[in-house]
Amino acid sequence: MIDLYTWTTPNGRKISIALEEFGLPYTTHAVDISKDEQIKPEFLKISPNNRIPAIVDRDNGLSLMESGAILIYLGDKTGKFLPKDGEARYRTIEWLMWQMGGPGPMLGQVHHFVKYNKGKAPYAEERYLKEAHRLYGVLDKRLADREFVADAYSIADMAIWPWVSRFEWQTVDLNQYPNVKRWYTTIAKRPAVQKGYKVPKDVGEVPMP
């Protein structure tokens, strides 16, 4: 049994979607970041960086923060969606790290400046929107000749998809990136994605282009 500490953010949805895909039993603990629940002492014991998501694996008592580390752990624990060795494993981790270092922080800045503070910092808006489109272009090129980023559906797709699901927040038209659009809609139809998207609470249907 996994205890999942999460909220309705792209990083949080990575893990709820993954747990559904892995078929692992889990208990959800909502951490409402709008109420600063992530800085409560009891949560800091699990996630010293006071960020969601975090997990505790009751099978062995292990607690983990950082969504990328959690995805690798769950992949290794179950033997699913993360190859055990060889190039396939490292391609999967490569694209997981791409998400952690690219779309995660950069699209997060787009949300901050474009959605929540539009007009307050034109330079920042221009900079991060430009980077958002560059990243979408990288992903579109990667998907030009393959169904998923590491060929087979993997934890890398689970990491990237929730950030693309906020394409409207990013003022991105997925029609500009047809390979991303095809990939996005394919994954959006997966039952585990539909279910995991609504954890820890239902805030609406999966956005569709």
Predicted segment positions?
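Charged, low-complexity, helix-prone segments enriched in Lys/Glu/Asp/Gln
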Residues: Y90, G196-P200
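GST-like domain detector, emphasizing the conserved glutathione-binding G-site
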Residues: M1-E126, K130, D140
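Short Asp/Glu-rich motifs
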Residues: E37-I39, T186, V206-P207
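Positions that flank functional sites
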Residues: I33-S34, R182, D202
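GST-like fold's C-terminal all-alpha helical module
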Residues: L74, L96-P191, G196, P209
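Acidic/histidine-enriched, glycine/proline-rich intrinsically disordered or flexible terminal extensions
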Residues: P200-P209
